[in-house]
Amino acid sequence: MADIASKEVPLHSVQVEALVVMKIVKACAATYPTTATGSIVGMDSNGTLQITNSFPFPTTDVATSDSHPNDHMAASNIAAAAPRSKANVIYQSEMIKMLKEVNVDANNVGWYTSANMGNFINTSLIENQFFYQKEPNERTVALVHDVSRSAQGALSLRAFRLSPTFMAAYKESKFTTENMQKSKLTYKDILVELPIIVHNSHLLTSFLHQMPVELPKKDLDFPASFADLNRNTPPTPLYPNMESLDLSIDPYLERTCDMLLDSIETHYTELNNFQYFQRQLTREQAKVTAWKAKRTAENATRATQKLAPLPEDEWERLFKLPTEPSRLEGMLNARQVEQYSRQVDGFTASITGKMFAVKSNLLPEQN
């Protein structure tokens, strides 16, 4: 009864132990820029998915001598597909059995993967998460750790699940315009992001608070009176200085803009392919319509001659209508464009004001 009640409560957050975060960061950084994947274990508690341990999947070594330039991409593709490979499924089961023997949470609650520059929304992510989420214990998540973003000083760890609408569409494998319009499925409905809470045990928290802090070796020069404090008033945040006008563009921002342009080009390529399909379909439908009109006229003539009418469904054998290409790739690319746009918007927030200030100083004054 408790399990049934817990499944009725939807997942609303993910709680990750700090040790698990360190394991994921270390595993992803060790294989960078090759994709790293692994399994996470834990338990579900009243809608909060508690992740208590993790372990990486075995990696595929690529020869460094006489290697092809595409070997790196091949290794990344193999690593990205690792969570659903048969060998790693067996490896995961054996690891969970060993964890159970040492009284560690042995419930698989998903998997993790590394990302570079926010580029993680692809078919591998969808297939891996669908592989985990379609199982009887579907309360699983995908943790995405952006190594390059974390190198800038802020941890980038996000949790995603496939939305129920997308799960139903992916099971049918029919991503046509008609089906997407019926289900009202858009690129925004592919993934559902859950908030992450980094958790420490009470024992570890107490230990951190009890750690001694090194005392300063030099005496601090405190002001002797309020008069000294007033004479040395620190500058306000808006105090004029040259550093605040620095327009240095983050290399991460430049690379993100380049990848955004590549994704936009891919979007136009997908759009041109779909428009080509529509033109082909229109031409074939025009031929079918003309053939039907001709056959109807022939049957009318044969009816006046008291002859048997000719079949009107022969067009299915004579003409072959083109098959509509899957719109899944276009949806994933649109979702990736949105991801890049959010990253660019976050980076340019602090630069836009400076650029407008420089522009106003460069333009001639208007009387």
From Swiss-Prot:
Q: Domain MPN spans what residues? A: 14-166
The family database entries (InterPro entries) matched by this protein are listed as: eIF3h (IPR027524), eIF3h_C (IPR045810), JAMM/MPN+_dom (IPR000555), JAMM_MPN+_peptidase_M67A (IPR050242), MPN (IPR037518)
Q: By its UniProt entry, which CDD domains does this protein fall under?
A: MPN_eIF3h
Keywords from UniProt, A to Z, are: Cytoplasm, Initiation factor, Protein biosynthesis
Gene3D superfamilies the record matches = Cytidine Deaminase, domain 2 (3.40.140.10)
Please list the GO terms describing molecular function: metallopeptidase activity; translation initiation factor activity
A cellular component term from Gene Ontology for this protein is:
eukaryotic translation initiation factor 3 complex
Give the protein's biological function.
Answer: Component of the eukaryotic translation initiation factor 3 (eIF-3) complex, which is involved in protein synthesis of a specialized repertoire of mRNAs and, together with other initiation factors, stimulates binding of mRNA and methionyl-tRNAi to the 40S ribosome. The eIF-3 complex specifically targets and initiates translation of a subset of mRNAs involved in cell proliferation.
Query: What do we know about how this protein assembles, alone or with others?
Result: Component of the eukaryotic translation initiation factor 3 (eIF-3) complex.
Its family? Belongs to the eIF-3 subunit H family.
- Name it: Eukaryotic translation initiation factor 3 subunit H
